[in-house]
Amino acid sequence: LLRGTVEAFLPTHEVFITDWVDARLVPISEGRFDLDDYIDYVIGMLQLLGPDVHVMAVCQPSVPVIAAIARMEAANDPHTPRSMTLMGGPIDTRVSRTEVNKLAEKRGIEWFKRNCIHKVPLPNVGFMRDVYPGFFQLAGFMAMNIDRHLEAHGEMFRHLVKGDGDSAEKHRDFYDEYLAVMDLTAEFYLQTVDKVFVKHQLPRGEMMHRDHKVDLTAIRRCGLMTVEGENDDISGVGQTQAAHGLCPNIPDALRAHWVQPKVGHYGVFNGSRFRAEIAPRIADFIATCEHLARKPARAGGKSGSSVVAFGGGRKGASRLAQD
């Protein structure tokens, strides 16, 4: 579903995107993968790509990405990215609670352990690994808007009857991507549910990475842009914007917030309104952060194009990283 996000930035930025392996394809002998590991990978990717990175985190990765940057800032890491753009992310799910948030709080973590975790079956390489199956996530998302999905399939049938192959093909292309889900390791899924949606550890200042506290007040140099959708029923309006209040030491010149009218969760990072209204604002924000970060000593050096990396972080003379 990030295909359109990448395409929007390719003409003007150097783009890198994180590539996570489906848990059912990883042998159990390879060990665990949890939220701490995710943050470690984000930090490692940013360090690999260099200090001129601009990170984009779409939805769930907003939490581990901002946590990773807080840890880097606290350590005065020279590879701290120039900016981060958090899009439709659950930074503080106590704000504008959606049905997703209410379910997590109502059920509690033990319910998710009992009902959502299963072992990978044969003949998959990850046989016997405990995972949260991708089809569970897919079923949950589709159930939230089942009428819309039924209507979309009815429209496709009507297009086929009329001989409108182009419209039907667009429908197929969308669902080819929408239905492409992967399994998550049980430990990563359960930690995310517990820390982000049940205990709200990040906004309460209680989140830990390994043995270190995640201190968002340490973020001072990295710019922060938040993007939300007016009709988002997964990450409600205000949940991502909450990051600004949690990062009080970022200068005002390095901040931006945008609520896109008339779009839901997926419209925040894909579709015509994203291309026409959101992507240009992100590009302007990246340019602003890049300009403010330049020093006179670098005036004669290479400027480079902004690099867009997706997810954990990535590269460039000026780079944008996305999850």
Describe the function of each predicted region:
Residues L25-P27, D36-H54, V65-A70:
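Conserved acidic catalytic loop of the alpha/beta-hydrolase fold
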Residues M56-Q60, G229:
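Conserved alpha/beta-hydrolase "nucleophile elbow" surrounding the catalytic nucleophile
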Residues L1-V26:
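Short, surface-exposed "cap/lid" segments of acyl-processing enzymes
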Residues G50-P51, P64, A68-E187:
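Alpha/beta-hydrolase-fold enzymes
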Residues Q260-A276:
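Catalytic histidine-centered segment of alpha/beta-hydrolase-like enzymes
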Residues D233-Q239:
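Conserved alpha/beta-hydrolase "acid-adjacent" motif
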Residues I219-R220, T226-E228, D232:
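Short beta-strand/loop motif that positions the catalytic acidic residue
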Residues V198-L216:
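Active-site nucleophile elbow and catalytic-triad environment of alpha/beta-hydrolase enzymes
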